Structure formats: C-alpha cells, structure tokens
C-alpha cells in the first residue's frame, strides 16, 4: 500500500507546477481504514467498551509500524522525501501517549476482557527501537503515512461501515439528489435471519426508529452489539478517535453524533475532552440541527421531519421574511447566551488555565 501510494505521487497529473513541487517535497500519503464498527460486531465486541478502545489503539499501532518499515525501505531504495530533516522530524511513535493515560483522562478505569487480551497477544511484536535505528540510517520516504478519511461513499460501495464510525442506525432513510431510500444494515439483517426474525413486519417496526436499544423482543446480545451512533455516549466517540489519533500522522475524520436535546454545555465538554486527549480535530453534529440533513435516524423520524419542514415552510410563507429572520436570530442568540452562562465561571476558568497566555501556548512548540 505504501509503495502504491508513493507511486501515485509520481504518476499523477498536477494542475499547477507549484502544487506538484509542494506535494513532492514531502511526499505525504494517507492510508486509513474503514469497516471498523462491522469488525467489532463480527468479533462480538460492543463499540462503547474498553475492549473496543484497546483493539483500536493496538491495531492502529500495528498499521503505523508496518507502514513506517515500508516507507523506510522505500527511502533506502529511492531516497527520503526532499524536505526530510532528521533534527525536526517527529514521528508518531515518539509522540504517542500510552493508552492507560488516555483512559485515565477520560475517567475510564476498566480493564480489557480476557478475550481481547488473548486477541492482542496474538499480534506480532512491534520493535520501535529497530525502526528508529533504520530511520537514522536511511530516513523515510513519506512525511506522513496515515490519515483516516470519512469513506462515506466508498464504504457504501464496499458494503461496510464507514471509517472508524459506529453504525449510524440499523435502519435509516438516506436523502440524495435523485431521491430518498431506506437502508438496513447488512450485518444486522444477517443476525436477524439467524434468529428467524427477518420478517417484513419486524424489520418495518425496527426501521421506524432506526435503533433496537429499546426493543425487548431482540436478544440482549444484539442490543448490546448494534449500538448506533446516537445510542453511544459522546465520551466513547472521542475515546475511539483519540486511540486511533495516537498512531495516525494526519487527522482522523470522526463525527460525535449528539442527540437533538444536547446543550451547548454538552458540546463544550466534548471539545474539551478531545483537546485533552490530543485529537487533532473534532466534529460534532447535533441531530436535526439543520433544516435538512442527508440521513435521518429511522424512517418514522425522517417522515416526521419532512412533515415538520413542510408545515414550517407554509408558516414562513404567511409571515414577512424580514420579521421571521429577526425573530429566529434573537431566539438563537438568547438561547446560546443562556447555555453559556449556565456553564459557570469554573468552566471558563478551567479553559483559561489550560490554554495560558498567547505567549505561553501549551498545545504546540511555538
């Protein structure tokens, strides 16, 4: 994979000479993953568990380790990237934080199960000391090796879950330019067939809500495994991203899906946790925070939203546009001020102490 991606840099046609020079100066590649949630389900491991975070951390390390060896091998064969400076280059294996530290920051004290310990014990050993020695001898071909992309489209083509995201819903309605259609998670359907529960009436009932968290007729094991993006607490979303981020050179595309009733304070806490855990970026999406969105959880919610939008449009047509806009902005501003004030002075003080002054930035070396 590293050789293929490195060759793409030379084979590609660049629209601007300036762009080509910039890319070839660092020769960054971005190998990532998808299908993470489906893999966990196949292993019988819930997404929102310490077991899943342990697997994420050590699988990410294994991927980075092999890519580092491959890129150093390419440097030995073809030379390191032109901008390589051994004094300034800081690889992930020198900056990655221990998993136990991440869990401690997030307030998680559980240990992995024997099952996961057994899985991890079968992973070949990594030797970062040897990698460092080889790096000193030959340099490295690519300034960046890994990047986890959203994989929204290619995961649909591959029939698997996207990126490192949990499944969005066991059934949902997707809206695209050519129309809308209902999707049911492929692996979930397979599990229903095993239990002889794949009756149209059962699937239709589940599709109404998109989640099986509160369906007593579905076995508890499945309810625990098929936890959807909105069933999972935000802290587990952030922990997954942080676990992968330690061994990913560039950014990690990950959305923290929050329920419609999430407050400004809830969002603030997610951003702070992501920063403390060393995530390079974070995305939060509160359900139904936009008048239109690509995916709605469950068919029932989707149709209800469409009806609400239709009624809202009719109401707006009956009012003066300027008056409608003024009211909306005033209400939104008042709501935001109220939420921020409820965070209290303690939260603001915590942020100020963590960030320090502009001349004393604690998040970078400058």
PLM regions: where:
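Catalytic alpha/beta core of large soluble enzyme barrels
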Residues: 2-11, 80, 121-125, 134-141, ...
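Long, low-complexity intrinsically disordered regions
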Residues: 329-355
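Internal maturation/activation junctions in enzymes
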Residues: 1-20, 24, 46-151, 270
């Amino acid at each position: 994979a590293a050789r293929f991606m490195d060759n793409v840099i030379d084979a590609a046609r660049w629209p601007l000479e300036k762009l080509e020079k910039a890319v070839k100066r660092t020769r960054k590649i971005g190998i990532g993953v998808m299908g993470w949630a489906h893999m966990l389900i196949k292993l019988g491991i819930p997404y929102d568990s310490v077991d899943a975070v342990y697997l994420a951390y050590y699988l990410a390390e294994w991927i980075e380790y092999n890519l580092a060896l491959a890129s150093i091998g390419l440097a030995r064969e073809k030379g390191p990237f032109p901008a390589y400076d051994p004094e300034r280059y800081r690889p992930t294996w020198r900056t990655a934080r221990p998993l136990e530290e991440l869990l401690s920051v997030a307030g998680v004290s559980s240990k992995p199960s024997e099952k996961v310990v057994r899985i991890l014990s079968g992973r070949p050993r990594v030797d970062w000391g040897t990698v460092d020695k080889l790096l000193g001898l030959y340099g490295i071909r690519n300034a960046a090796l890994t990047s986890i992309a959203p994989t929204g489209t290619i995961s649909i083509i591959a029939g698997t879950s996207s990126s490192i995201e949990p499944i969005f819903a066991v059934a949902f309605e997707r809206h695209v330019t050519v129309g809308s259609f209902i999707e049911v998670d492929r692996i979930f359907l397979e599990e229903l067939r095993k239990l002889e529960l794949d009756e149209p009436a059962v699937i239709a009932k589940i599709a109404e809500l998109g989640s099986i968290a509160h369906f007593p007729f579905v076995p508890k094991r499945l309810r625990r495994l098929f936890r959807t993006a909105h069933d999972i607490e935000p802290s587990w979303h952030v922990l997954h991203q942080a676990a992968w981020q330690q061994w990913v050179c560039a950014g990690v595309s990950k959305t923290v899906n929050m329920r419609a009733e999430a407050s400004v304070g809830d969002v603030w806490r997610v951003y702070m946790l992501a920063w403390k855990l060393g995530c390079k970026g974070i995305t939060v999406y509160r359900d139904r925070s936009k008048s239109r969105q690509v995916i709605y959880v469950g068919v029932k919610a989707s149709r209800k939203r469409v009806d609400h939008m239709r009624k809202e449009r009719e109401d707006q047509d009956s009012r003066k546009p300027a008056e409608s806009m003024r009211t909306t902005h005033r209400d939104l501003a008042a709501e935001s001020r109220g939420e921020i004030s409820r965070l209290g002075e303690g939260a603001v003080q915590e942020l100020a102490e963590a960030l320090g002054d502009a001349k004393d930035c604690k998040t970078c070396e400058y």
